[in-house]
């Protein structure tokens, strides 16, 4: 599904990703672990085409198509979704209107307003989001936990092929992480894939982790199975710095 080869990326004069390789097959869940500033969020943004970053070398293929010439909205229409670490507030646009418009843009099909409203409220109930939030402006006045659950609401509503989740669990209490984890598990199936950045193994409890990758200084220094998540939880990143 996703193939990244020898990816070099810079922002301004600073090189951030240094020869990164990553392959994600349909149906897989990949976890990215690494200290702050190691390039994890940069990778997510580059996959979706953030204009801040410049690819100086390498390739990104999604379902066999080279993404590097595509704009952000074109990549989103291909089925790529990014859940932001710090979701932005968008005054003037309600949650329901934004999600309905986004889904219509991605699918190219006209969305029936009443049917969509009913489906949205059902998802909101599962995520323990009060129904009145559907008519509130996107993330305006939302708490940190409400913003993160709203990201999962977007994920479930838009149903992308590839979900990029950038610390969707950060800053959440135990109960909120459980809700988010269950929401991601509800989304994931054999026809889509997830790449998850996290420092908290709890969000992974409902997910079958296929591969875990250790990020250091803009590179993947080690890849393995779910056991890497436990190794990092117990020993931190120092052992991998020695290996790299």
Each language-model region and where it sits:
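Conserved hydrophobic segment flanking the Walker A/P-loop of ABC-type ATPase nucleotide-binding domains
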Residues: 20, 24-26
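The feature captures the beta-strand-to-loop junction immediately N-terminal to the Walker
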Residues: 33-35
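Q-loop/switch helix immediately C-terminal to the Walker
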Residues: 86, 92-107, 119
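Walker B catalytic motif
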Residues: 167-168, 175
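Conserved beta-strand-loop-alpha-helix hinge in the C-terminal portion
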Residues: 215, 219-241
């Amino acid at each position: 599904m996703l193939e990244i080869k020898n990816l070099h990326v810079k922002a301004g004069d600073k090189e951030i990703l240094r020869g990164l390789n990553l392959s994600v097959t349909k149906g897989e869940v990949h976890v990215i672990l690494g200290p702050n500033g190691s390039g994890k969020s940069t990778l997510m943004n580059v996959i979706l085409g953030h204009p801040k970053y410049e690819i100086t070398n390498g390739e990104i293929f999604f379902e066999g198509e080279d993404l590097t010439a595509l704009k952000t909205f074109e990549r989103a229409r291909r089925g790529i979704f990014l859940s932001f670490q710090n979701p932005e507030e968008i005054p003037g646009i309600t949650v329901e209107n934004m999600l309905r418009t986004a889904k219509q843009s991605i699918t190219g099909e006209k969305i029936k307003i009443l049917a969509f409203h009913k489906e949205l409220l059902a998802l909101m109930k599962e995520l323990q989001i009060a129904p009145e939030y559907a008519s509130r402006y996107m993330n305006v006045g939302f708490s940190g936990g409400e913003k993160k659950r709203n990201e999962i609401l977007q994920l479930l509503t838009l149903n992308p092929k590839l979900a990029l989740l950038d610390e969707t669990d950060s800053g959440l209490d135990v109960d909120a992480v459980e809700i988010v984890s269950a929401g991601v598990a509800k989304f994931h199936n054999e026809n889509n894939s997830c790449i998850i950045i996290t420092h908290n193994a709890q969000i992974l409890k409902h997910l079958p982790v296929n591969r875990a990758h250790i990020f250091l200084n803009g590179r993947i220094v080690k890849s393995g199975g779910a056991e890497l998540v436990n190794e990092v939880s117990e020993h931190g990143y120092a052992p991998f710095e020695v290996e790299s």
